[in-house]
């Protein structure tokens, strides 16, 4: 009998044993996710882990808060102690490491500062994707008002990619966004805050064609796709940002990672399982399930 721990082999998806080399090549890139837990599994770290894994990267986590929620809303939030958030980040970086840190729900200034301090200790050498989560799909606030300035001064200015939706961009810039041109102007204001790139998402505009704009110092790229008329969109922002983070961790350029991420999320929405009575989750596993 062959001992698996000794021969260091594992089964691939066709049932064949894989060598060390093949196993190493099957998963590339490490993403440390600093975000809140969604008990319903549609958003937060649950969506992040599923997304990163489905795209072939490795996901580690530092849980910032635990929420009681389902497709109908958020019913409770339990804050994780700051010292324990920091401990989660520290032990992961000391052992596993990370190519990218992706942030989600950082609900108060102290949490934002904790993540920023961890980045500084690493010499700001780890790429950073900031999803400025402010409000849950059901309307529950996930970011204290007094934390917005900390988000701008401590993380947005250090981000490789910032991924706000329209309401988040309005809060961050103090502007009103009702058109694609407004999106572009807000994106430029956000870019002036220091991130290398800003992906401003146009899903909240009432247009049949959904438009996202990626702005960076080297230029602008516009992405368009047909709007999918569905309520099963819970966790789209988390999933998109994590998909971008996975791509960057795997060595992709930001525009390439963004293009793959948008396709991944579009397909995840279009094949959503239809769970729950409210805003249902996506099908994060669609790249892995072949009929």
Predicted segments, located by residue:
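Conserved N-terminal subdomain of the carbohydrate kinase-like
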Residues: 21-33, 53-138
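Charged C-terminal helix
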Residues: 23, 28, 79, 255-291
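Short pre-catalytic strand/loop immediately N-terminal to key active-site residues, enriched for Gly-Thr
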Residues: 34-40, 221-234
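Short, small-residue alpha-helix embedded
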Residues: 51, 170-171, 230-254
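Phosphate-handling active-site elements
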Residues: 55-60, 221, 247-261
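Conserved phosphate/ATP/ADP-binding segment of small-molecule kinases
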Residues: 145-220
């Amino acid at each position: 009998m062959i001992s698996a721990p000794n021969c260091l082999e594992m089964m691939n998806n066709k049932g064949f044993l894989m060598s060390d080399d093949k196993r190493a090549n099957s998963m590339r890139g490490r993403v440390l996710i600093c975000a809140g837990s969604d008990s319903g599994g549609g958003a937060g770290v649950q969506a992040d882990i599923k997304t990163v894994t489905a795209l072939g990267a490795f996901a580690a986590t530092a849980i910032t808060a635990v929420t009681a929620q389902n497709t109908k809303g958020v019913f409770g939030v339990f804050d994780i102690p700051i010292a324990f958030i920091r401990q989660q980040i520290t032990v992961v970086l000391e052992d596993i490491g990370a190519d990218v840190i992706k942030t989600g729900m950082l609900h108060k200034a102290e949490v934002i500062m904790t993540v920023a301090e961890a980045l500084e200790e690493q010499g700001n050498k780890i790429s950073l994707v900031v999803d400025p989560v402010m409000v849950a799909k059901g309307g529950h606030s996930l970011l204290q008002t007094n934390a917005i300035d900390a988000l701008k001064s401590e993380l947005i200015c250090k981000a490789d990619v910032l991924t706000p939706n329209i309401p988040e961009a309005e809060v961050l810039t103090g502007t009103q966004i009702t058109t694609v041109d407004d999106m572009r102007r807000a994106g430029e204001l956000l870019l002036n805050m220091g991130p290398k790139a800003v992906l401003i998402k146009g899903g909240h505009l009432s247009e049949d064609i959904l438009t996202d704009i990626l702005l960076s110092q080297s230029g602008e790229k516009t992405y368009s796709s047909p709007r999918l008329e569905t309520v099963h969109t819970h966790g789209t922002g988390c999933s998109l940002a994590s998909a971008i983070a996975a791509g960057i961790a795997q060595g992709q350029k930001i525009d390439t990672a963004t293009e793959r991420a948008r396709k991944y999320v579009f397909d995840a929405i279009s094949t959503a399982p239809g769970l729950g009575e409210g805003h249902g989750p996506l099908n994060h596993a669609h790249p892995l399930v072949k009929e």
